[in-house]
Amino acid sequence: MASFNSFPIPKQIVGSSSSSSSSTSRPRILVRSSLTSSMTSTNSMLVFVHPHPLIKHWLSLLRSDQTSFPIFVRIPMTSVVATRWSFLSSVKEESRIYQNDSLKACGCASVSPYTAQNNVYVELKDPKENIGVGSAERSYSSRSMLQYNLLAKNLLALEETFVALDSVRMERDIMLQMGKLGAAELFKTCLSRYRGSSITSCLSDTTELVDTTPNQQVFVSSRRKVKKKARRSSVTAENGDQSSLPIGLRTTWNNIDVPRVRRPPKYRKKRERISRNETEMSTGVKIVADMERIRTQLEEESGKVASLSCWAAAAGMNEKLLMRNLHYGWYCRDELVKSTRSLVLFLARNYRGLGIAHEDLIQAGYVGVLQGAERFDHTRGYKFSTYVQYWIRKSMSTMVSRHARGVHIPSSIIRTINHIQKARKTLKTSHGIKYAADEEIAKLTGHSVKKIRAANQCLKVVGSIDKKVGDCFTTKFLEFTPDTTMESPEEAVMRQSARRDIHDLLEGLEPREKQVMVLRYGLQDYRPKSLEEIGKLLKVSKEWIRKIERRAMAKLRDQPNAEDLRYYLNQ
C-alpha cells in the first residue's frame, strides 16, 4: 500500500456536528502523492467525491440502475503541488491551536479512503444508497449526508484559502516591483496609514502568512505626527492656553497679572559675538593704518620708497613682527568689508540717479567703512554698524559732489547749497513762502547773505554748447557764443603800439641791461623767465641778474617819455 501524507485541516474547513460532539479526534484528509511516470507526464490528480442528491437524480435519467458511483474530478497537479507547501505553514500553526479546543468537534469521524494506483482519491459513500434496509443503514446514511455537507464546506474553505494565497503572491510581487522602483519606503508608509481600512481587513489572513515567511515585511508607523502634537501642546502650555478653562473664567484669567521670568533673547549671545568680532577687526584696521602712516612719512622725508628694514625700525619692531601685523590687519580689513557689504548696498540706494555709477558708490562706501574703523571706539557702547553709517554717507556724498557735475564745485559750497535747499523747503511747507528771499534764508541757515548769493550762482544749470537753441531752429548755442580767446582789431592795434613804445624806451639802456629786461618780462617770445634761468643763460649768478634789473628799472623811471606809457594802462 502506498504511503500517505496527512496534514490537519484548518479551522475554516473543520465543521461541528452533534453526532460527533464527544469525539476529540481531528479529521484528516489523506493524500497520496503520485509516484509513477504516468502521473508525472499528466501533471494532474483525481479527487473522488460522492455525488449530491440532485446530481444523482440528474444522472438517474441517464442510467437505469440507482447504484452509487464515484465521481472523479481532475485537478492540475502543478497547482496542487505549488499550493501545498505554502498552505502547510499556516495549517500546521492552526492545528496546534485547535488540537487543544475540545469544543470543536469533528463531524467526519470515519473516512474510508479509496485508493487507486497512480492517483490520489478521497472517498465518501452515497447517503441515499439502500434506503429503508435497516436502522444501521439509516444511521450510516445520515452520517454520510452530514459528511457530504462538511466536505462541501471544506471545499469552499479550501477555495477561499487558495484565493488568499494568490493575494499573498500578488502582494509580494507588488513589494518587489516597488523595491526596484525605489518607492518601497513610501509604499510602506502609505500602507501603514490605512492599516484599519477595508483593504487591510480583507488581507488579515495574508498578513499572518507574510509574518511567518523569511522575507518578513515590517510596517513601522511614522512618529512625526506624534512629535508635532507634542510640540504644539508644549507651546500651548507655555503661552497659557485657556481653551481648557470654562468660558466664565477666561476673562478673569486675562485680567490676572501673572509674573513671568524674563528670559534673555536667543540672539543675545550672537550679538555679543558679532560686536566682539567687530571690535577685533577695527583694532586690526587701526594697526595697518598706523603702519602705513609711518611708511608715508618715511617716503616724504627721504624722497624714495622705504625698505622693509627701515619701516620696521621706524615702527619700533623687527621685520617678522611687522609682517605679522600687516597680514593680520589686511585680513581684518577684508573681513570687515565683507561683513558690511549689505549695509553699504542699503545706503547706496539713496544716491542713485545723481550721475555716479552704482559700483563707484559701493567703492566709496567701502572707503567710508575703513575710515570709520580707524576712528571707532568700542568703549563708548555703540555698535560698529551704527557708528560707521555716518562715514559711509559722508564718503558717498563727497564722491557725488566731486564727480556729479561737469564743473567742479568745492565741498564747502556743496554743503551750503544743501542747507539752502533744505531752508527753502522748510519755508515753503511751514510758512507757505514759495520764493524766499536771501535774507530769510540767511536768517534760517546762519550763513551770510554774500555766501548765499555765491552759492546761488553755482546752482545754475550747466548745458552743452552743441545743444540747439529751440525745437524749431537748427542753430546751436556754439554759433551765438563769442570766443574770448580771439583779440579784437582794436586790441591788436593797441598791443602793437605798446610794444613799439616799450622798445623805444629800452634804447636808452645798456646792451646787457636791455637783454636782461627782455628775457625777464618776455618781450620777445612772450615767455617770462626767472632770475635763475637768466643767470644760467648769461653764466652769472641770479644775484648779479637782480642787481642789473634794479639798475635798469631805475633808469627807465627817470626817462621823460615814461609817462606816455600810462595811456595803455588806462585802456
Swiss-Prot record:
Induction: Slightly induced by blue light, especially after dark adaptation. Residues 1-25 are annotated as: Disordered. Transmembrane segments: none annotated. It comes from the Eukaryota. Residues 1-32 form a transit peptide. Residues 531-550 bind DNA. Keywords: Chloroplast, DNA-binding, Plastid, Sigma factor, Transcription, Transcription regulation, Transit peptide. Highly expressed in leaves, to a lower extent in cotyledons, and barely expressed in roots. Present in seeds, seedlings and etiolated plantlets. Belongs to the sigma-70 factor family. PANTHER family: RNA POLYMERASE SIGMA FACTOR RPO, RNA POLYMERASE SIGMA FACTOR SIGC. This is RNA polymerase sigma factor sigC. It comes from Arabidopsis thaliana (Mouse-ear cress). The gene is SIGC.
